[in-house]
Amino acid sequence: MRKLGIHSFVWTGGQTQAGLEEALEKSAATGYRLIEFAYLRPEKFDLDRLAKKAQDLDVEIAVTMGLPLSADVSSDDPAVVKAGEEMLTSAVKAVRDIGGGKLGGILYSAHTKYFTQPTDRGRKNSIAAIAKTADLAKAAGVDLVLEIVNRFESNLLNTTAQGLDFI
């Protein structure tokens, strides 16, 4: 049977260690066995402490995120793509280190409204970045979950057909 989960933002803004720990405690106390955290920057949070608390409370962790324009792996700019690949690598490692099993969200482009269609080069850059990240995630025991979103959140994957074609 699948576990029922809840996003940490229901309980807290997710900006502090104490807030995330409180979200874990409240989730467990109300019967949830899975919590979704927004992107965890390793330099900001004590991932070992969060992992221990989650384990003690028997709550699984999933992490979701969207890339900023400065780290858009669907960009035509190699430096921006590289920044995105580095951010995704860091995110996979953070999910692994916190004992999580899933990294999801808008991992394939920036989380923003675009005013142009994606370029062929940008799409290929995104596919290559996700393939590279998938290899790292597989080795780390982390599933990647690509969130297909509406056109106001990304220009690359807006339909199930586009998502299936992408993978």
Description of each model-found segment:
Residues 1-100, 120-121, 138, 153:
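N-terminal pre-domain/capping segments
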Residues 78-167:
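Active-site acidic/histidine proton-transfer and metal-coordination neighborhood
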